[in-house]
């Protein structure tokens, strides 16, 4: 390939499993795949964007990187490119970026930790999301994300959560709510808190998965 040892000093290399996605379970009810947590969120996000026929509102999808290390760097959700982009779009219409963000709504797509009977000690059974909870897709919007007493979480407003709940019910979306692991035992974070910091109403949404970071 014409590479030398020096090229590895600036190379960005990724080692990933080579096997294809497959059905898992006695009834083939589960999907097993590398990177399933990212793909199950990003694919419906951009297909919904492409299929949106209404021109009443401006819609966008942001696919960010580095979430597992705190959304740092120029490709993470803490980068200013998102606010810069909104400011540029607002300026083209003679609007103010801060006002546009205040009137914006965001669904932060990320998977939730589904209840796993093999590791049930880190979950709260009465406040967890479950796989195969009914027909269609099982969406969650866990407000109590975060860890260590739910520090670092995003607390969506009751009004916005109610708006999303009404939207789901009117469109036949199967949904459930649940926390991201038992308080002070399980836990995790999403990029929702960074978007909410921009004064954008934000709520987490995503399918529950198990074995989230396994190969």
Each PLM stretch: what is its role?
Residues 2-12, 55-61, 94-103, 168-182:
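Flexible, glycine/charged-enriched surface loops at secondary-structure junctions
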Residues 6, 116-119, 123-214:
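Active-site-adjacent substrate-binding region
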Residues 28-30, 50, 56, 60, ...:
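Class II aminoacyl-tRNA synthetase catalytic cores and aaRS-like
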Residues 6-8, 22-24, 38, 50-55, ...:
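Solvent-exposed alpha-helices and their adjacent loops that cap or buttress functional pockets
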Residues 1-33, 51:
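Soluble metallo-hydrolase cores and metallopeptidase-like ectodomains found primarily
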Residues 26-36, 67-72:
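A short glycine/serine-rich beta->alpha loop
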Residues 33-38, 179-181:
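Active-site nucleophile and cofactor-binding loops and adjacent substrate-binding regions
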Residues 43-131, 136, 186-187:
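Acidic/histidine-rich catalytic neighborhood of metal-dependent amide-processing enzymes
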């Amino acid at each position: 390939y014409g590479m030398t040892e020096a090229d590895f000093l600036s190379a960005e290399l990724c080692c990933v499993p080579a096997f294809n996605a497959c059905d898992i379970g006695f009834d083939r009810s589960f999907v097993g795949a590398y990177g399933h947590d990212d793909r199950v969120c990003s694919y419906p996000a951009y297909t919904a964007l492409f299929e949106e026929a209404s021109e009443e509102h401006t819609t966008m999808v942001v696919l960010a990187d580095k979430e597992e290390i705190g959304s740092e760097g120029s490709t993470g959700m803490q980068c200013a490119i998102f606010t810069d982009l909104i400011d540029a779009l607002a300026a083209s219409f003679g609007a103010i970026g801060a006002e546009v963000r205040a009137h914006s709504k965001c669904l932060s797509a990320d998977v939730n930790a589904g209840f796993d009977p093999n590791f049930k000690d880190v979950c709260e059974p009465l406040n967890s999301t479950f796989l195969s909870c009914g027909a269609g897709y099982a969406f969650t919007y866990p407000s109590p994300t975060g860890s260590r007493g739910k520090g670092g979480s995003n607390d969506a407003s009751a009004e916005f959560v109610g708006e999303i709940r009404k939207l789901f019910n009117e469109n036949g979306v199967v949904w459930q709510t649940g926390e991201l692991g038992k308080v002070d035992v399980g836990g995790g974070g999403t990029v929702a808190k960074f978007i909410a910091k921009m004064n954008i109403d934000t709520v987490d949404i995503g399918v529950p998965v198990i074995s989230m970071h396994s190969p």
